[in-house]
């Protein structure tokens, strides 16, 4: 198990080319298209720089489609107004400043973040916060399963 805990993120992560992402100014329709296939998408400032600025998930959809009369969430002391309209962009509904990790961090570091922040995935970024990939609990489980099956 020690070898597993010391494994670097870069050895397990899914590379950026294989993960869902969109620009922060993407429209509501693009967001819904992406989320109808995947449970999340990383949000980057633009496709040239690829700096991670947020994440959109199924929970973000839920937060924004619940009728105002059923919402428990309050912002600035008042109930939020519906944000679903054609002009809505991903930046309006995403979770800002997601928890991130570097490719040099270890599985132990990632597990601590998953536990501390009660999350299931992390964006893997370089020192300039550019998206390199992602690591998920599911990936760690698959890696651990592989190790158990292939060691005697």
Task: Give residue ranges: language-model regions.
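Tandem CBS (Cystathionine beta-synthase) repeat/Bateman regulatory domains
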Residues: 1-152
């Amino acid at each position: 198990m020690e070898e597993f805990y010391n494994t670097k993120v870069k050895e397990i992560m899914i590379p950026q080319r294989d993960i869902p992402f969109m620009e922060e100014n993407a429209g509501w329709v693009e967001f819904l298209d992406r989320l109808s296939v995947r449970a999340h998408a990383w949000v980057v400032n633009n496709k040239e720089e690829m700096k991670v600025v947020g994440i959109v998930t199924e929970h973000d959809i839920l937060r924004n489609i619940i009728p105002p009369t059923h919402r428990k969430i309050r912002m600035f002391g008042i109930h939020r107004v519906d944000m679903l309209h054609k002009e809505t962009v991903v930046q309006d509904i995403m979770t800002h400043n997601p928890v991130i990790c570097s490719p040099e961090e270890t599985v132990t570091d990632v597990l601590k973040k998953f536990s501390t922040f009660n999350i299931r995935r992390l964006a893997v970024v370089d020192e300039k916060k550019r998206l390199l990939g992602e690591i998920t609990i599911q990936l760690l489980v698959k890696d651990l399963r592989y190790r158990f099956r292939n060691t005697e």
